[in-house]
Regions:
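A domain-start/cap signature at the N-terminus of enzymes
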Residues: 1-43, 75
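Serine-hydrolase catalytic machinery in alpha/beta-hydrolase-like enzymes
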Residues: 39-116, 120-126
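The conserved beta1-alpha1 loop
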Residues: 46-50, 162, 188
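Gly/Ala-rich beta-loop-alpha elbow adjacent to hydrolase catalytic centers
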Residues: 136-141, 145
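Conserved hydrolase catalytic core segment
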Residues: 147-157
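The feature captures the conserved acid-bearing segment of alpha/beta-hydrolase catalytic domains
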Residues: 164-246
Length: 253
């Protein structure tokens, strides 16, 4: 069994009349992990985030606050710190699209680490073995979450906010694979395609094609939400909207 060590238990966080514990783990196989949890949680949300977000914390707490305002069911959220997004979240190697850093192929290792962590998180926070697990994220973390839906049976729902579906080779992959998750949320800003980058400019076309592919899958519940603004506006709120929709579908199911 995977064991989490070096917990730094923080003061309780009050949110919408609900009290949360905030636990920080300084080291695990990928990096630091921040867990916000209520007593007797019934669902586990997992989200890869940048290291700076773990340190700053304010935006993550605001995201949890938004989810808690909409969902009455108690839950736990594990924010997983990712040091090198281009390496650790990319499903395969690809040349740089912006900046100088090429994309690596570390997504499979990151997925394996997260899957290894799930049983210990459920044990530590008193979640039942069959409690639903939701994976989500923003930008490349959203693409990683979407890719994980195709590669793993570990997740009941995927919240992919502004996923990098322009990623080289992604749609070719999605056309010949089938997602294992039953619920997939997609969203995009309505101005995300307003960019000079010729590859990223295709994102609106790509997200619509991705959504159309998901709509052909039997049983799968999916939606595509359009948010006002470009890629860099309100990421926490957009992630919260995705998790809320996924939780609502699970509760309805």
């Amino acid at each position: 069994m995977y064991v989490i060590e070096e917990k730094d238990e923080q003061s309780p966080v009050d949110s919408n009349g609900r009290r949360w514990r905030c636990d920080e783990y300084s080291e695990w196989e990928v990096g630091p992990c921040l867990v916000l949890h209520e007593p007797e949680p019934r669902a586990l949300l997992v989200q890869p985030v940048e290291q700076e977000e773990i340190i700053e914390r304010k935006g993550l707490i605001e995201e949890v606050d938004a989810i808690a305002a909409a969902i009455d069911v108690p839950f736990a959220v594990a924010f997983i710190s990712i040091a090198d997004w281009n390496q650790q979240l990319s499903p395969w190697q690809a040349p740089a699209v912006f900046g100088k850093a090429d994309f690596g192929a570390g997504a499979r290792e990151t997925l394996q680490h997260i899957e290894n962590l799930l049983p210990e998180l459920k044990r530590r926070y008193d979640l039942s073995a069959d409690a639903p697990v939701l994976l989500g994220g923003y930008s490349l973390a959203a693409l990683f979450s979407l890719w994980s839906a195709y590669e793993s049976h570990s997740f009941h729902a995927i919240a992919a906010a502004s996923p990098s579906v322009w990623f080289p080779g992604w749609l070719d992959y999605a056309k010949v694979h089938h997602p294992q998750a039953d619920i997939i949320y997609l969203s995009l800003g309505d101005r995300e395609d307003k960019t000079r980058n010729p590859i990223m400019r295709t994102v609106s076309i790509c997200i619509q094609e991705q959504h159309a592919l998901l709509q052909t899958e039997p049983i799968l519940k999916t939606t595509l939400a359009w948010n006002p603004g470009n890629h860099f506006q309100h990421p926490e709120q957009r992630c919260a909207k995705g998790f809320i929709w996924c939780m609502e579908q699970l509760l309805l199911g």
